[in-house]
Amino acid sequence: EALAETAAGMTANMAAAAVAADPEAAADIAGEMMEVMGDIPNVPEEFDMAGQMAEMATNMATQAVAADPEAAADIAGAMMEQMADIPNVSDEFDMAGQMAEMTANVATVAAVANPEAAGEVAAAMMEQMAEIPGDDMADHMADMAAQVAEAAPGSAGEILGVMAEANPEMAGDMASAMAEANPAAAQSAMAGLAEAVPELAVEAATAIAEASPELAGMAAAGVAAGNPEAAAEAALALADANPDAAAQIAANVANANPEFAAEVTAAMAEANPDAAADMAAAVAQFAPGAAEAVATELMSNNPEAAAEMASAMAEANPAAAGMVAAAVMEAAPEAAGEAAAAMADLNPSVAMAAASAMAEADPAAAADMAAAMMEANPAAAAQIAAGVANGAPDQAADIAVSMAEANPEAAAAVAGGMASADPEAAGDIIGAMALANPDAVNDIATGVAQMAPAAAGDAMGAMAEANPEAAIAAASAMAAANPGAAQDIAAAVIEANPADALLAATAMAEAAPQAAGLIAAGAAEVNPADALLAATAMAEANPAMAGNIAATVAASNSEMAAEIAGDMASINPEGVAAV
């Protein structure tokens, strides 16, 4: 027996070497080697020489196809004939199974070596399998599908399509075998099948989901990619079989084919309304490109759930909040207030995006929506105001006034948010707010200085014009809130009322001593004479700032350098070196 096994092994090794040298002659070499193996003397009856021959033929076929993948069909056919002629096959040996294994190996190796011809080779192998004696090829076909999915996932779709076309009854089993063997190939496999044999798409996708529930979404996505017209039917069937996966299915379909996402998700939501918000949220998170279309469709079908869906989608993906808000305005404007409040309650960034989209969609209703949002989340007042200013700039001033009236405590945040979003319009917006609510001027001024320092000068000018009596107090509040903006603020308040230049400068310096130099520089922008008076008064009140005042004014207006230096030095002789 040992001698027989050694002889058979030696023969197989020689055959392998010969095939490596001349792949095209693989079948002929196999035939000659089988004759040699048949002539090995003194082989015990219990030794399975037929099995050795079949295994050798399988290995030779695989090796030959790897070397010449274009000849795969011819090699497999010729090798099948050689295997059919193997003598003395025992009843226990599964020659049909060995032939099927050889065929599967050939298909797999060919798919790896030449992906472009994978479908053609798979079709030829299915024909070869059909000629294998015996009627139990189902398991072998499924094994072949699994083997290909593992080794050549990129060709899985094309190969499954060909295999399903050749044997429709096995489509589901082959699809689930592929998905189970390589989950990453589930979507491409279903796409190929759905394109090649559309009528089998739903059945095969369902088979995948039954075998591997976690792949339901990928199966649905495959159908959507390969045959969009069947996407809704497949998604419904899969969600019906596995309700817990509804959101995943909706998201995968939307990601695979955004164009059909709204139609598919709407059909699923109609079948299972309780899961609509979860589906919408999953789409927003995993397929944001389809979020607005899906939201519009779902909300137009069920306006009463618009707020819930909007909130769920914005929470799942804050970056999609603007699109979702736009969908609310288009599909369910009657739910806009509730939806706006629900979205604002999530976080400030969502509130800003939603406010912007809603204000742009309906500027006339922006004030009411902003008020509803601010009531839901007062801490987001600045972001809501900024969003409104972005979305409806022409109505920003009126909306700012109404927001401050609705919540006076938020006046600073509203002013700051508006000014930061639209610095060029800050003057008009802040002026309107100051005129409407004189008692809140200081708060308004503070908000702008802190959140939009670049707009502080324009805002101060507008406030001084709207309420001259409160201008100096407002300027002082702004300087205290943001000393770095003091120069623009001082220039604006003094330009608005030159007669009170000295009073304004000293009041601001008292509120923000560290900004004395900037205040003097601001005064110098308007009137150098006033700047000297203001600088002198500030330095007398705070001699330690003399050097800072001199340097800041000189940097702003070099022509005044000598004069301001002299004045400061005379006020503080001991600090002349510092000056």
What are the language-model segments listed below?
Residues 1-579:
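General marker for long, soluble alpha-helical cores
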